[in-house]
């Protein structure tokens, strides 16, 4: 990344992250059966220390989760430097918020995504390469 273009990369990352967050959590709460389509075929999800890989396994995992209501409080994003992911446009997205799963109390969570740009004939589609979800328990 040339330093002169860095603001452009940051702007693209922020727009991609904002759009992604809206799509991801809306899909998680309302159309979960479609959620695995947002992941690359080789993507890995680590959910509170438990790893799930591949779209079929991801679909099965998401279908097992109770209904949810996510509230996003913080979104941070940044482009990943070209040296870390050569020839691949990549964005790191960090989310903090609260979630209420049916039958459970509301909890704080943190979720980190690594998104990669997948070119299609009409536009760029961002796919999840890596996803790490953690419940956050506050120390007293």
Curated annotation (Swiss-Prot):
GO terms for cellular component: cytoplasm; nuclear pore central transport channel; nuclear speck. CDD domains: NTF2 (cd00780). It is found in: Nucleus; Nucleus speckle; Cytoplasm. It comes from the Eukaryota. InterPro entries: NTF2, NTF2-like_dom_sf, NTF2_dom, Nuclear_transport_factor_2_euk. Keywords: Acetylation, Cytoplasm, mRNA transport, Nucleus, Protein transport, Transport. Residues 16-135 form the NTF2 domain. Its main location: nucleus. The modification N-acetylalanine is found at residue 2. The keyword ATP-binding does not apply. The keyword tRNA-binding does not apply. GO terms for biological process: poly(A)+ mRNA export from nucleus; protein transport. PANTHER family: NUCLEAR TRANSPORT FACTOR 2. Stimulator of protein export for NES-containing proteins. Also plays a role in the nuclear export of U1 snRNA, tRNA, and mRNA. The NXF1-NXT1 heterodimer is involved in the export of HSP70 mRNA in conjunction with ALYREF/THOC4 and THOC5. Heterodimer with NXF1. Forms a complex with RANGAP1, RANBP2/NUP358 and NXF1. Interacts (via NTF2 domain) with NXF1. Stabilizes the NTF2 domain of NXF1 by heterodimerization. The formation of NXF1-NXT1 heterodimers is required for the NXF1-mediated nuclear mRNA export. Preferentially binds Ran-GTP. Associates with NXF2, NXF3 and NXF5. Does not bind nucleoporins (NPC) directly, its association to NPC is mediated by NXF1. This is NTF2-related export protein 1. The gene is NXT1.
């Amino acid at each position: 990344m040339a330093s002169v273009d860095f603001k452009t990369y940051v702007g693209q990352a922020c727009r991609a992250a904002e759009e992604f967050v809206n799509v991801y959590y809306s899909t998680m709460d309302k159309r979960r059966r479609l959620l695995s389509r947002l992941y690359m075929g080789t993507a890995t999800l680590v959910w509170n220390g438990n790893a799930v890989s591949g779209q079929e396994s991801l679909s099965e995992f998401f279908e097992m989760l109770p209904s949810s209501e996510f509230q996003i409080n913080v979104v941070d994003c940044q482009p990943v430097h070209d040296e870390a992911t050569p020839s691949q446009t990549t964005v790191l997205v960090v989310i903090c918020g609260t979630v209420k799963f049916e039958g459970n109390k509301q909890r704080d969570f943190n979720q980190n995504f690594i998104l990669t740009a997948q070119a299609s004939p009409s536009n760029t589609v961002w796919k999840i390469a890596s996803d790490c979800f953690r419940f956050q328990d506050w120390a007293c």
